[in-house]
Amino acid sequence: MYRWLAEKLGNVSVNRKLSIGFGLVLVLTLLITFTGWTGLSGVISRGDKLGYISSLNGLTKDLRLARLDFEMRRGEQGTSAVNDLITQLDSGLKTAADLIEQPDDKLVVEQQQDALGQYKKAFGAMVQAGLKREGARSKLGDTADNAVAKINEVEKSLLQGDSVTLFNSVVDLSKLIQQARFQVRGYTYSGKVEAEQPALDAIDNALKKITDLNDPLPEQYRANLQEASVSLQAYRAAVSQYRDSQVASAAAMKIMGEQGDILLDRSNKLTTSQTVVRDTDAAHAKNLLLLATALALAFGVL
């Protein structure tokens, strides 16, 4: 073949040979350039995708920190920090779903989107539980204050009378109410489940004392006793409301913790997978460039 090509070229003029040679060099140069450019573009694209996925990983970690801060401060700083990060991550995952081509990796992104949806729902539930908890706190203060005020009126009136026994009984009731408030405060400040029942028992003791005083006390004091009893019953209901909000908040936090772990796990898995894709594309581009170079050298020898 080489001899045949040499004979053919021997019949071609020098200018034509130079033109053919220059054209061949130009074609081979363009081939190498195109191969290199295509490979480089692919690697850059994969690198950009990997960088974008890494930014989502960072957002996921920021979301966890913001959620922990929200829990620690009991929502004092508001919900904007967590909600903003949820919005950013949701938008980022939608973009990632469009950027990623591999079916398995698309499935991973869908799992992240599902986890984020459940995370968002759980956070909303936790916020609502927090609002109910603070509402219960407010009721606790108002109802207890009203009960104390009504009993104090009775106590002051009896202090001016002659019945020491009745006065001491009302003083005992005041002490029971104060004991109930002490137990309830211990429960609400600690949030410990085991502190709830002692608080309820203390309230029940005060309610029983009011019932016991209904007959011995004169008729004029029974309206105050009745109002104090109603306030203590509302006080007890507020303790139960506080408990329910605590249970709801704990359940929401558990879900958020689980979904947050899924988000981080899938994000790491996606990063690893896309790194492999990038490295594979880089190796493929390198092989294409080597092939184009080898072809150029082969034509050059010919």
Regions found by a protein language model. Name each.
Residues 37-68, 76, 80-83, 87, ...:
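Juxtamembrane membrane-water interface segments immediately C-terminal to a transmembrane helix
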Residues 56, 60-70, 109-112, 116-126, ...:
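Short, structured motif recognition centered on aromatic/hydrophobic residues
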